[in-house]
Regions:
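Mobile "lid/hinge" segments at catalytic clefts and subdomain interfaces of large enzymes
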Residues: 74-332, 336, 341-345, 349, ...
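Glycine-/charge-enriched secondary-structure boundary and capping motifs
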Residues: 1-10, 14-16, 20-33, 171-173, ...
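A generic alpha-helix structural signal
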Residues: 21, 37, 53, 109, ...
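Generic alpha-helical segment signature
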Residues: 10-13, 240, 603
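Short histidine-centered beta-strand/loop micro-motifs
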Residues: 188-191, 414, 660-662
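Non-catalytic terminal/interface segments that mediate subunit docking, oligomerization
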Residues: 44, 53-103, 107-109, 113, ...
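N-terminal amphipathic, basic-rich helices that act as targeting or association modules
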Residues: 2-78
Length: 736
């Protein structure tokens, strides 16, 4: 008898249970209930987000595969396709930071090579609580070590990403992992069974008890006690995954298999039921044949285990021996555990008894889709209303404090733990506006960027959703890349709270507008709800991963000032906006609004101008203006170039000086160029109706920033670099 306590343990409501009984035609047994629990979880079933996600633009001439498969696929020409996706591993990384982050990397890698692609790069978007608190530092160290430990051992470069710090992430750190791979477009594989009578093979590592109900755990709030959920976190083996990659690609090459699915969230349950549902078939499985590393496992445990480094393959019977020979060579299990059958049902036997008999359509396609109550977000009040924001007494000190804020400070302490050069495709080191990856044998290159500003999104969710897309595309423009597609990881609190659903709906609206403006399709992604501990939700955090193409890598724009005497030009308009800025937060201890406004038409023009100038070879450097505004962008341009080069800049009167220096107005890029190319750039700007102003030059060994001739900031590059470079390492040294 299934009572309310059992339903609560499985995160199912009484109404959902009634629907299950109706679909199955009887009351399910406990193992069958476990199957519905994981497949109808928020993590797998998207029951609170599906009605909104389907509004996203997913079509385009380059789209080979959009949402619905293990990863999105875009045609990039020359017979190649790029396969990419982003996923979250937030809840596991809070409970067990090292393994949570490591298996997040492992899972996204499998999503990519399941499609037949070889992973060529990983990026990550990380959010932690303030690093001056011991627990937050411990989580951060564990997460970074987990990413490095798995990625480095597997042999995939971690080429960039973003790291933010905010008190809201102290109880809910976010670990979003993006992966990109390459495949010949005529050798893409899908999760399908294809034909009745085909063999179902279990390949890879053995099944244990780790990760059981991991998907369900990721679909619920945390309370005061999380230690008991530690067994829900999977344990990864990157060396086993490397063997699995090579064995899978070798079996795919001659077409020995007809379909393949990663055993990720919900494990064997998800892979069997989804493959059957997509192909309109059924599957029969004998659990006695499943390789197990622990004794006495029950059907419930075997079906729901999320042990890592496992795949489900479907092959024609006459090909099974060939597949097994390949996996034996790589010292991996490849065992026939069942077959494809007619009837559209998942039938599972254990010790000779039938323990599961369920319609796959009910498991996969008939999960309820909720239009949850929502409250439209209220616009944030203007910064300074009620309590005016005073100007700093000393702008140079404010500038140095901003450079040392953990969100802005140098992240080399993190990046240096990652191998970013393995595979030798990495063209730009981590820290550039976007990652750039060579396409060997071609002049073309791929670029990728991850972006999302959670504070801006809290203050204005719709603009925050649009701005995440816009900034990711802007970062691509800064390296000379044209955006071609986007994947998303949407991190929110409890969707049962109307204010959270209101934020989510508004973010989706903003993303839709921006994706349409840039004509880029959404190829898939992930929603992570219930980032909520003891009733407190994180700031809404959409993270957008945009992929782009550089037609000639020799014209890619590298970060950093190059030569004394070069002219510094600001593309775009600075407005009187300090709301939601890192300056307001770090210097004044406030998080007022409103967020900076975004005009997508202006944004497109600025990016198009930057791309055109890059293609013409006019730019020596380009850097987008985001956290910290113009002052930080100029400083970073000094740091990424020759360390002995400063800049002298004089800005117009008319705006608050702190808004000029530190405001985060959208749609701006700081570029440097040779004096001989200035007139051509300004002419292009006039023709394209883009505001562009020569604001200074690369000069000396100091960063000197003035307004209408009045000096505001005068700091040596050496002093600024020290503040920026040492901020995060010093936190760990001081508190070691």
């Amino acid at each position: 008898m299934i009572d309310d306590r059992i339903l609560k343990d499985h995160n199912l409501t009484r109404d959902e249970f009634k629907l299950i009984v109706k679909l199955v035609g009887r009351e399910p047994n406990l193992t069958e209930l476990g199957i519905f629990s994981v497949m109808w979880s928020e993590h797998c079933g998207y029951k609170s987000s599906r009605v909104h996600l389907k509004k996203l633009p997913t079509k385009g001439p380059a789209v080979i595969q959009g949402p619905g498969e293990n990863a999105g696929v875009l045609d990039i020409g020359d017979g190649l396709a790029v396969v990419f996706k982003i996923e979250s591993h937030n809840h596991p990384s809070f409970i067990e930071p090292y393994q949570g982050a490591a298996t997040g990397v492992g899972g996204i890698l499998r999503d990519i090579f399941t499609m037949g692609a070889r992973p060529i790069a990983v990026m990550d978007s990380l959010r932690f609580g303030p690093p001056d608190q011991p627990k937050n530092r411990s989580i951060m160290e564990g997460v970074v070590s987990g990413i490095a430990g798995y990625g480095n051992s597997f042999g995939v470069p971690t080429v960039g990403g973003e790291v933010y710090f905010d008190a809201g992430y102290a109880q809910n750190p976010l670990v979003n992992v993006f992966c990109l791979g390459l495949v010949q477009k005529d050798k893409i594989f899908y999760a399908k069974t294809e034909g009745v009578g085909n063999a179902v093979l279990y390949v890879g590592a053995k099944t244990g008890r780790d990760g059981i109900h991991g998907a369900t755990m990721a679909s619920a709030e945390f309370g005061k006690e999380t230690e008991h959920k530690r067994p829900n976190v999977q344990v990864g083996d990157p060396f086993k995954e490397k063997l699995l990659l090579e064995a899978c690609l070798e079996a795919m090459e001659p077409g020995l298999i007809v379909g393949i699915q990663d055993m990720g969230a919900a494990g064997l349950t998800c892979s069997t039921s989804e493959m059957a549902a997509k192909s309109g078939t059924g599957i029969e499985v004998d659990l006695d044949l499943v390789p197990q590393r622990e004794a006495g496992m029950t059907p419930y445990e075997i079906m729901l285990s999320e042990s890592q480094e496992r795949m489900l393959m479907v092959a024609r019977p006459e090909r099974v021996a060939d597949v097994q020979a390949i996996f034996a060579k790589w010292d991996l299990d490849a065992v026939v555990i069942g077959k494809v059958v007619e009837g559209g049902r998942l039938k599972v036997r254990f010790h000779g008894d039938e323990v599961i008999d369920l319609p796959v359509d009910a498991i996969v396609n008939l999960c309820p889709a909720y239009k949850r109550p929502s409250v439209k977000p209220k616009p944030a009040k203007a910064a300074g209303k009620g309590a005016p924001v005073s100007l700093p007494d000393n702008f140079s000190k404010a500038f140095l404090k901003l450079l040392a804020s953990p969100t802005i400070a140098d992240k080399e302490w993190i990046f240096r733990q990652y191998d970013h050069m393995v595979q030798t495709n990495t063209a730009f080191l981590p820290g550039a506006d976007a990652a750039v990856l060579r396409l060997k044998g071609s002049r073309r290159a791929l670029a990728a960027s991850l972006d999302g500003n959670s504070l801006h999104t809290r203050l204005d969710p719709k603009t925050g959703g649009a701005a995440a897309v816009a900034e990711a595309c802007r970062n691509l423009a800064c390296v000379g890349a044209r955006p071609i597609g986007v994947t998303n990881c949407l991190n929110f609190g409890n969707p049962e709270k109307p204010e959270v659903m209101g934020q989510f709906e508004a973010v989706i609206e903003g993303m839709i507008e921006a994706c349409k403006a840039f004509t880029i399709p959404v190829t898939g992604g992930n929603v992570s709800f219930y980032n909520d501990t003891e009733g407190t939700s994180i700031n809404p955090t959409p993270v957008l991963g945009v992929v782009g193409i550089i037609e000639d890598i020799d014209k890619a724009v590298r970060p950093g000032f190059k030569a004394a005497g070069d002219v510094v030009v600001l593309l775009g308009e600075t407005k009187d906006e300090i709301g939601g800025s890192e300056y307001l937060k770090s210097v004044h201890g406030r998080e007022d609004g409103p967020a900076p406004r975004l005009d997508l038409a202006v944004e497109k023009k600025v990016q198009k101008l930057c791309l055109e100038a890059a293609g013409l070879g006019l730019l020596q450097s380009a850097h987008d203006l985001s956290e910290g505004g113009l002052a930080v962008a100029l400083a970073e341009s000094c740091f990424h170039g020759r360390k002995d080069l400063g800049c002298v800049v004089d800005l117009e009167a008319g705006l608050r000086p702190d808004a000029l220096l530190f405001g985060e107005s959208q749609s701006r890029i700081a570029v440097s160029l040779r004096p001989a190319d200035l007139d051509r750039l300004l002419e292009l700007a006039r023709e394209r109706k883009v505001r562009a102003a020569a604001i200074g030059k690369v000069y000396g060994e100091s960063i000197v920033l003035s307004q209408a001739g009045k000096k505001l900031v005068d700091v040596t590059v050496r002093e600024a670099f020290k503040a920026w470079k040492n901020a995060i390492p010093d936190l760990f040294k001081i508190h070691a």
